[in-house]
Structures are given as C-alpha cells and as structure tokens.
Design a protein with these regions (language model features):
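Generic, well-ordered alpha-helical scaffold segments in large soluble proteins
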Residues: 55-63, 132, 136, 140-144, ...
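Aromatic-lined carbohydrate-recognition surfaces of secreted/lumenal glycan-active proteins
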Residues: 72-80, 125, 129-167
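Substrate-binding cleft/loops of secretory-pathway carbohydrate-active enzymes
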Residues: 80-94, 153-188
C-alpha cells in the first residue's frame, strides 16, 4: 500500500520486520498509517513551541512589560497534550531515534501488536515522547517565564490515571519540575 507510513511482515524470530517492497511468498502485510489532526499542534516539536511563545508570551511582554512579576504574576497552561484520541507520533521522534542509530519506523508496529518482543520499543518510544513533551513544551515556557520575571503554572491532561497519561504526555510528574506552581485538575 503506497499510502502506508510503514509496512511490516511477520517474522518468526523478530515478530515483525519492516519492508519497503513486496516480498515473494508473503501474502499478509501489516500497515501503519500516519494521520494528523487539525485539532492539535505538535508541541513535541521545539519550533512549534517557539512559535507559540513568540505569538503569545512575547506579545504580552511587548505590551505589558511593566506588569510582569507584579500584577501579571505568571502564565497558566491548560491541558497541553500531544493527542489523546489516537496513537501519538511526531517527526521529531524519528530524529531522536536516529541519534541512537535506530529508526522509529522499524518499531511502530509494536504500538499496535502486544508481544514481549515489542516491550523495549514501546518503553523507549513513550519515554522519548515524554522527554520531548517536557523539554520542548514545559521547559521552554518555564525558561521563558523565568527570564521575564513571571511564573508558570497549569496542568497536563489526564492526570488522574497512569494509563490515561500515556494518551497526552506519557507521564505528568516529569513536567512538574518545570512549573513554579504545579497543579492538577480534580473535578470530582
């Protein structure tokens, strides 16, 4: 399927192997497709957060600099997430995996097929997403706030259950390091 982002075939030893062309004698292929959502921006991408800061925080600072650290104590971020209604993906993850000599595409099948052979990939994948979430969103805004005399507070999405945290940020606790006033959303 030419529209597939990654194509895999079953392999007795490895579980699955990514292929880029049809394989003789193979009739069953497992395809992974890449879909995007207009409802979400890629906050794992540092360029996206830089643009967000430039278009919001920098504008506030340009207009209200004299209030920063006084009347304007800080910024509140509400439920940042990489996307909670589908399996998350960012091209930035591919770059991060390449730094270790791996391809994220080679393991994507393990986000959908549960087998012990895929555990290491799933763990590395979600740890990578969480690190990108913390470094490229929370830390960037936290550092900007600190440099401009104000504080950062807010909360992530789905703090109430560990499994649900995988949907939005892979874990919420690491982000608290980069909030002056960490918060959670408890609605009942």
């Amino acid at each position: 399927d030419k529209t597939a982002f990654a194509v895999f075939i079953a392999d007795d030893e490895k579980g699955f192997v990514r292929v880029e062309a049809p394989v003789d004698g193979v009739s069953e292929y497992h395809n992974v497709y890449l879909r995007t959502s207009p409802a979400n921006t890629d906050i794992l991408n540092p360029a996206v957060t830089d643009a967000f800061i430039r278009e919001t925080h920098e504008e506030y600072y340009a207009r209200f600099k004299e209030y920063f650290g006084k009347e304007l104590v800080g910024f509140f971020t509400d439920e940042p997430q990489y996307y909670r209604w589908a399996t998350p993906y960012t091209p930035v993850a591919e770059v991060e995996f390449e730094k270790t000599g791996e391809s994220v595409k080679d393991g994507l099948i393990w986000l959908f097929k549960h087998d012990e052979r895929g555990y290491a990939f799933r763990e590395k994948y979600y740890e990578t997403l969480n690190r990108l979430y913390v470094e490229n969103f929370y830390k960037k805004i936290y550092d900007w706030c600190g440099a401009h005399g104000c504080k950062l507070t807010g909360h992530s999405i789905e703090e109430s259950a560990l499994f649900a945290q995988m949907w939005g940020g892979a874990a919420v606790m690491p982000s608290y390091e980069f909030e002056d006033i960490p918060a959670i959303d408890w609605l009942g």
